[in-house]
UniProtKB/Swiss-Prot annotation:
This is Mitochondrial carrier homolog 1. Protein insertase that mediates insertion of transmembrane proteins into the mitochondrial outer membrane. Catalyzes insertion of proteins with alpha-helical transmembrane regions, such as signal-anchored, tail-anchored and multi-pass membrane proteins. Does not mediate insertion of beta-barrel transmembrane proteins. May play a role in apoptosis. GO terms for cellular component: mitochondrial outer membrane; mitochondrion. It comes from Mus musculus (Mouse). It is a multi-pass membrane protein. Residues 1-93, 177-209, 280-322 are mitochondrial intermembrane. The modification Omega-N-methylarginine is found at R29. The gene is Mtch1. Keywords: Apoptosis, Membrane, Methylation, Mitochondrion, Mitochondrion outer membrane, Repeat, Transmembrane, Transmembrane helix, Transport.
Length: 389
């Protein structure tokens, strides 16, 4: 059996190159048998597979690299990594909660302070509503600093459940390995890759959204109790009992459809726009080495500037698309608190909506589909209708 035998090449140490090297070395030493030199380089018999039953070689498969059992730094540390993500997410959620709290109160139309007269960039007199900082100071005056964190507990639980759900889905349905496609000649392959990745992200986002939405509803209702100074929803367990008793199982999923639609539109819009911009407007020949010779003489710097531009493109597209999908977020949050027995979900703050489409049409007529999208410069529009106190 020669070194070039296809049955030996996959498992023999060194393969054909090792056997050829043995022959060359034997010839240099004056005719020593090549087989002796080859046997001297072979591993001990205890570690050598039978030639007719070769032992399968260890493959650096995607499962090991993705965090499967036995993966260095991933398989055994997966629970630790997931717990770290949950902890970091909880910290970010807690820090950003006052911002979202004020935003929700503005979304439901609660304006406890009257607008003030100011001038715009053209010098015209306009009415401005209080900014985020002024609104936050008002909440501190009424409820103290701890009042800025009303409804934080169910929101922390919602985000943690969403993170754990996404991590579990990645283990059960691991994503396929994708190759980096950046050439305009590979547009079909690249577009298929984007569609496949976006479909996978959409599946994870929709499932995690559905599982975490009941806690999101509880968090929203806990926060809007500030409007009427109610205490109907005080804890997670008691809130679950109240919602189930008054509204049934569907009460936990009010406002879910606009949130899901917003997530789907955001994912597809952001990924497809970023893909087409990167494919048609970003030049792969851009190099950061002098003279434009970096791609041949320094492969490590190949497409470095193009890759940097691509990374920023998706970020910018995310901001732009999130502005376009904001009405879905607004309608979903309003439906979560509408007609639930709280003052913020009843007239004069809001009519009782029959469906999320009814809510959308009402806000569109009032010119309020982007209410709460800006927290710094909030100008009173001509069609605004607020319940001022």
């Amino acid at each position: 059996m020669g070194a070039s035998d296809p049955e030996v090449a996959p498992w023999a140490p060194g393969g054909a190159a090792g056997m050829a090297g043995a022959g060359a070395g034997a010839g240099a030493r004056g005719g020593a048998p090549a087989g002796v030199e080859a046997r001297a380089r072979d591993p001990p018999p205890a570690h050598r597979a039978h030639p007719r039953h070769p032992r399968p070689a260890a493959q650096p498969s995607a499962r090991r690299m993705d965090g499967g059992p036995g993966a260095p730094g991933s398989g055994d540390n997966a629970p630790t990594t997931e717990a770290l993500f949950v902890a970091l997410g909880a910290g970010v959620t807690a820090l950003s909660h006052p911002l979202l709290y004020v935003k929700l109160l503005i979304q439901v139309g609660h304006e406890p302070m009257p607008p003030t007269l100011g001038t715009n960039v053209l010098g015209r007199k306009v009415l401005y509503l209080p900014s985020f900082f002024t609104y936050a100071k008002y909440i501190v005056q009424v409820d103290g600093k701890i009042g800025l964190f009303r409804g934080l507990s169910p929101r922390l639980m919602s985000n943690a459940l969403s993170t754990v759900t996404r991590g579990s889905m990645k283990k059960v349905f691991p994503p396929d390995e994708m190759e980096q496609v950046s050439n305009k000649d590979d547009m079909k392959t690249s577009l298929k890759k984007v569609v496949k990745e976006t479909s996978y992200e959409m599946m994870m986002q929709c499932v995690s959204r559905m599982l975490a939405h009941p806690l999101h509803v509880i968090s929203m209702r806990c926060m809007v109790q500030f409007v009427g100074r109610e205490a109907k929803y005080s804890g997670v367990l008691s809130s679950i009992g109240k919602i189930f008793k008054e509204e049934g199982l569907l009460g936990f999923f009010v406002g879910l459809i606009p949130h899901l639609l917003g997530d789907v539109v955001f994912l597809w819009g952001c990924n497809l726009l970023a893909h087409f911009i990167n494919a048609y407007l970003v030049d792969d020949s851009v190099s950061d080495t002098p003279g434009g010779l970096g791609n041949d003489q320094n492969p490590g710097s190949q497409f470095s500037q193009a890759l940097a531009i691509r990374s920023y493109t998706k970020f910018v597209m995310g901001i732009a698309v999130s502005m376009l999908t904001y009405p879905f977020l607004l309608v979903g949050d309003l439906m979560a608190v509408n007609n639930c027995g709280l003052r913020a979900g009843l007239p004069p703050y809001s009519p009782v909506f029959k469906s999320w489409i009814h809510c959308w049409k009402y806000l569109s007529v009032q010119g309020q589909l982007f209410r709460g999208s800006s927290l710094l410069f909030r100008r009173v529009s001509s069609g605004s209708c607020f319940a001022l106190e």
